[in-house]
Amino acid sequence: MGEEKPEVLDAVLKEAVDLENIPIEEVFENLRCTKEGLTATAAQERLAIFGYNKLEEKKDSKLLKFLGFMWNPLSWVMEAAAIMAIALANGGGKPPDWQDFVGIITLLIINSTISFIEENNAGNAAAALMARLAPKAKVLRDGRWKEEDAAVLVPGDIISIKLGDIIPADARLLEGDPLKIDQSALTGESLPVTKGPGDGVYSGSTCKQGEIEAIVIATGVHTFFGKAAHLVDSTNQVGHFQKVLTAIGNFCICSIAVGMIIEIIVMYPIQHRAYRPGIDNLLVLLIGGIPIAMPTVLSVTMAIGSHRLAQQGAITKRMTAIEEMAGMDVLCSDKTGTLTLNKLTVDKNLIEVFAKGVDADMVVLMAARASRTENQDAIDAAIVGMLADPKEARAGIREIHFLPFNPTDKRTALTYLDGEGKMHRVSKGAPEQILNLAHNKSDIERRVHAVIDKFAERGLRSLGVAYQEVPEGRKESAGGPWQFIGLLPLFDPPRHDSAETIRRALNLGVNVKMVTGDQLAIGKETGRRLGMGTNMYPSSALLGQTKDESISALPIDELIEKADGFAGVFPEHKYEIVKRLQARKHICGMTGDGVNDAPALKKADIGIAVDDATDAARSASDIVLTEPGLSVIISAVLTSRAIFQRMKNYTIYAVSITIRIVLGFMLLALIWKFDFPPFMVLIIAILNDGTIMTISKDRVKPSPLPDSWKLAEIFTTGIVLGGYLAMMTVIFFWAAYKTNFFPHVFGVSTLEKTATDDFRKLASAIYLQVSIISQALIFVTRSRSWSFVERPGFLLVIAFVIAQLVATLIAVYANWSFAAIEGIGWGWAGVIWIYNLVFYIPLDIIKFFIRYALSGRAWDLVFERRIAFTRKKDFGKEQRELQWAHAQRTLHGLQVPDTKLFSEATNFNELNQLAEEAKRRAEIARLRELHTLKGHVESVVKLKGLDIETIQQAYTV
């Protein structure tokens, strides 16, 4: 057998045997395995033959990848400048501009090298993170069930498939109940197909119902999915981030093009300038105006941010999900496990018994029999844990068949034989589902609902238990009449940090809505305990097939937008809630864990698979949590906003620099016919690139509200700040070249109306002035308040100091004839630093003015909150948090907007007294709104004239 085995497996490898269609016994024979699975040694040997169970990744050439960083619109402009330097500049009696050509190529290589190294590091980090999300499979090895990476599966392995699993390899099903399999990803079939014992299932399809064991028949590239993947290449969609990047790049390129056209028209036909100096001036605009490092800075910032998120317990599967997370303003959160601990307890004293001759202990035993003893969920563990010995759940009986939980039936069931050989069946699950089974439903329905409501008022979930005899003795038979025997109360305590996290979320402008499958009263009680509000609706009344007539005339979208949560939610309702919130222009996040949550997770702007989610939910999500609880999501929101803030800061900076270089040097060239050496612009660009890379690790204050790309804000701020810097350079040039101001005030050597040779010193002075103030601009764009108040990252400061020290040394000492500059000495260097410092201060005021003009709120930062004029730490933080909370509750219709209460008050003392009373009333109202059931609902009632309490009471599930 040992000699024959490799040959047989070789036949399987070459697909000479049709394992998909031959009888199942022959499958075992051909794969040389049994239903007891493989040994670890045999599996290792087969791994060497068949390879890993994953698709071959196309390895890109590292050289081509490196050169790829030089192939984008921004690099094309630089490459055009390099060609200009040796082709077009070769005239006017002068040789080609080799130093500029070499400088441009050096800049491109430096930029590509940084991009290559950073992206390689980010790629390695991303690969390590994605490895944590690698699909797992339950496999029988050495006679024991183990959880292994799906990548190590081999033909002949016995695997277990259950609800929510993505099937890890092509397999044939063994004995058991039929499965419902969703093959839409492979075949396009919209409805799940039923697969029974002996049928084949494909890798990549999803188990929608049932549980069964299967034998693996093909892995990796030999699977149906693997062969299909070889035929088609995945298409890369252009994401929103890429569109923004393109828009900013195009703006910079167009600005340069406009500047060059104006220069060409004025210099040659009007001023009749010499050919070669004109080309040099055009090169200055081309080289200095292009933000060559922009793609690198932004992608590296996102990659580093993604790694930071992973450390916090949120793994991003799609990089651009970070920008969506930063803009998220509504989060629909599961209750169980996210807002609560998902650690259930049962109070035996509260158990209600509905059958004669049955006591509370018997109800617990029957519920335990309808539970798993292995691979338990939270409910199974809580119920089996109530027994003195967990083995009692199967003591004295023989298990015939177990029906696992699924979202449709919402119950589990066990068919078993007792010691006398009689067959029985016991089921536990959602009370409504169990009640529907009962033969005497009409007799007990009122009492059952009364008990459920009594439990719900105390925040307790209910679990129904029913029992039947199966006289036919077959597991397939319907059995005798079901007897409803009892209701168990389940308590799932809220997480200790949930209430505080919800308060933080509201202060950050994120409205948290509870989405729960539990009944309305439980949702309201949990909402009350967490301080998130009790303005909740039964989702079936709003979104179900049979919407209630009394609220059908009401604006459903508006009710959904203003609701604090939804109860009795089915997976299809989640999808509808997300869709309607998006229609109201909200950036919506949705948490989920089950296979049926996948459509809602895909539809949401940010699909969040919670800790312990099924493979299907993880596959559909954008972010996968590795820790439980809402606090992970809110931390991820803050981190995402910080990442987004860094990217936004850089884009404003990049646009500003383009405008300042193009406008500043164009005016110098056209007004005073000053030819700035292109090589020195290259030096500025190289030093800038080195410094600006550190922005990806800068210390920033996240936006206090959801943020998104606002191109109008970026371009307006960039144009105004860039225009200001350009004018400062023009004024400096005029003062140094046309007046005696600096020599008179500071005692430095004069540059006034100097000879042409001394343009070299003027070039050095302009170089230093442009270099310092251009790079210092990053400190203005990175801060929301005064730039000298918000402490920047250590790396950014060090990089700035080193770069400007180098720039100062070049300006002071360099006598480079090839670059047409001459050292200006320490006196002029000091003058330039002072000049830049004086004209740096108005940059913050201009920033506030732009923000005020765009939003009308910027002066709040300076005057109302006074954060710029105090040395106190966190001055006014509490008041600001309350203001944000107030603004958000007003936005979502949860309190009446501000009105001018004191318009008629004329007496100053009276006004003060009124103000104090109003403050006290406002604080009482705020606390009441946060902590009482009535406070949350009354504003909606007032605004809409709706009797919301009546609506809610009429639809208690």
Curated annotation (Swiss-Prot):
It is a multi-pass membrane protein. GO terms for cellular component: plasma membrane. Keywords: ATP-binding, Cell membrane, Hydrogen ion transport, Ion transport, Magnesium, Membrane, Metal-binding, Nucleotide-binding, Phosphoprotein, Translocase, Transmembrane, Transmembrane helix, Transport. Belongs to the cation transport ATPase (P-type) (TC 3.A.3) family. Type IIIA subfamily. GO terms for biological process: proton export across plasma membrane. It catalyses: ATP + H2O + H(+)(in) = ADP + phosphate + 2 H(+)(out). Residues 1-66, 120-248, 302-648, 699-714, 782-793, 845-957 are cytoplasmic. The keyword Translocase applies. One of its GO terms (molecular function) is P-type proton-exporting transporter activity. The active site is at 334 (4-aspartylphosphate intermediate). Expressed in roots, stems, leaves from both vegetative and flowering plants, and flowers at early and late stages of development with highest expression levels found in flowers and stem. It is found in: Cell membrane. Its EC number is 7.1.2.1. This is Plasma membrane ATPase 1. It comes from Nicotiana plumbaginifolia (Leadwort-leaved tobacco). Mg(2+) binds at residues 593, 597. The plasma membrane ATPase of plants and fungi is a hydrogen ion pump. The proton gradient it generates drives the active transport of nutrients by H(+)-symport. The resulting external acidification and/or internal alkinization may mediate growth responses.
